[in-house]
Amino acid sequence: MSSGKITQVIGPVVDVEFGSDAKLPEINNALIVYKDVNGLKTKITLEVALELGDGAVRTIAMESTDGLTRGLEVLDTGKAVSVPVGESTLGRVFNVLGDVIDGGEDFPADAERNPIHKKAPTFDELSTANEVLVTGIKVVDLLAPYLKGGKVGLFGGAGVGKTVLIQELIHNIAQEHGGISVFTGVGERTREGNDLYWEMKESGVIEKTAMVFGQMNEPPGARMRVALTGLTIAEYFRDVQGQDVLLFIDNIFRFTQAGSEVSALLGRMPSAVGYQPTLATEMGQLQERITSTKKGSVTSIQAIYVPADDYTDPAPATAFAHLDATTNLERRLTQMGIYPAVDPLASSSRALTPEIVGEEHYEVAMEVQRVLQRYKELQDIIAILGMDELSDDEKILVGRARRIQFFLSQNFHVAEQFTGQPGSYVPIDKTVHDFKEILEGKYDEVPEDAFRGVGPIEDVLAKAKSMGY
């Protein structure tokens, strides 16, 4: 192990000098430094980011640099940060370095570990399947279905329900799927991670789940690399065990945000809106590894925060290019009390073709979108002149569109404690059948309010009956 000395500490950036004759550590190598805290030696991991010349390197700390001083000895480990992989990770909670943070016993020193930096699978190793992943959420299954082994992005501004939707997907898919799941919390609230951990523990899903967290209070180095830690654990199950893995990431924007902080600290010239010039490269390196190969599949569901609800912001715009399906959450729908607040016209999926979902499903989905689009066009006329100016056919269409809009809402299992209503899981065939009947006008006389926050059409009729219809 070659060793050097700290020459400068500026926040999470630490400069280390190895001397002009010494062997310099490679980029992305992990360095170790021990700091003295009240007589106890504490290990801090640094990752090499730049070579400055004259035997010096600039590193990013993965933990707080409080207590580091100039002159402290730094050791080069000779390899990248590596984290535990395999069966032993299931049911456990880790940080970016693969250290256990759930209060349980540490991993043995000889546990199998993999480096967090590796190349994406080659072109000939990739595999594409065209099987729909049923979520039990009507608006998703009908209008923007997910693919097994595909990549899904949940886009939305602050407070429109991304994390609740991802938790419902964990509830519905992880419990039905029965396979292995990896949840990665990137720069989000610790409270949400804690809630999710206890929910998973109560439901028993934790036994088949590995959880990795680098939350809001962590230094930018940890937030930037924690997504790679979760991905490394998922890749092992895919490549070595040939498993079909579910990878949940909340939130990809925080990965970009941390990269932006690190880039500024390293002195790189910012690009558009102050983001790092390497934004597309960093996103590509992460996203290209999240893929399905001939050995196994990774189905990833990623929450992506949209700053100020601006979809043209470089961070969400860069992520768009990598996804098979997008679920767009809309603030206007939350204001109408429609949850999940999924925009049925803006959400998209490459799975919505007759070859993949079938002719009937495709036709019903297209007709639902046509009715909603026409309703959107008529809203200006209604706002200015009122409903009376519409033709009879248009009045019928508006009534159906409003019923469809409300019927796209649904009660969630994970929101039961807030709504007081039990959650509902609707099979995809039932969803298609129910929307087809609404489009045919079978429920034109049922009050609109009966369609809010329900599961299948039977719930609507029961609700209408209780309302005295």
Swiss-Prot record:
List UniProt keywords, sorted A-Z. ATP synthesis, ATP-binding, Cell membrane, CF(1), Hydrogen ion transport, Ion transport, Membrane, Nucleotide-binding, Translocase, Transport
Give the EC number(s) listed in the UniProt record.
7.1.2.2
Could you tell me where this protein is found in the cell? Cell membrane
Can you list the GO cellular component terms from the UniProt entry? Answer: plasma membrane; proton-transporting ATP synthase complex
The positions annotated for binding ATP are G156, G157, A158, G159, V160, G161, K162, T163
RNA-binding recorded as keyword: no
What SMART domains does UniProt report for this protein, alphabetically?
AAA
Q: Which InterPro entries match?
A: AAA+_ATPase (IPR003593), ATP-synt_VA_C (IPR055190), ATP_synth_F1_bsu (IPR005722), ATPase_a/bsu_AS (IPR020003), ATPase_alpha/beta_chains (IPR050053), ATPase_F1/V1/A1_a/bsu_N (IPR004100), ATPase_F1/V1/A1_a/bsu_N_sf (IPR036121), ATPase_F1/V1/A1_a/bsu_nucl-bd (IPR000194)
Q: Predominant location of this chain?
A: membrane
Signal peptide location in the record?
none
What is the stated purpose of this protein?
Answer: Produces ATP from ADP in the presence of a proton gradient across the membrane. The catalytic sites are hosted primarily by the beta subunits.
Annotated protein name in UniProt:
ATP synthase subunit beta
Q: Which organism is it from?
A: Lactococcus lactis subsp. cremoris (strain MG1363)
